[in-house]
């Protein structure tokens, strides 16, 4: 029982520092239990209590995957990330595909040119384009590796 309280406190302290998804918090709590020096029986009881801890946090609105995806999409697009790299980030964090698509649709309605702006930010941060570099193919390859389409990359690098 005491270990469950410790695990709840760890979840609260983690959530006070970071905004995260349910699946990611589940992974973090599993890792915490794995690192604890307990016998197998106690670890199994803690593993089974993780789901109830997460549902309690979700009921109290401390974890919200929809809010997490919308805020992360906004911040990652301002960092110069492409749609493909943002989707791979969310898949890694365990966000459902339909929630990702819904969040992208909301972003497209608010700002239809967000990916173009994000590509401009990426090119500026990496010093790509005619102003900085004479090697167009290398710059184009760097944009492609970042997940931007060929046509969009070509437009950004030529301007």
Language model regions located:
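An alpha-helical, amphipathic repeat domain used for nucleic-acid recognition
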Residues: 1-159
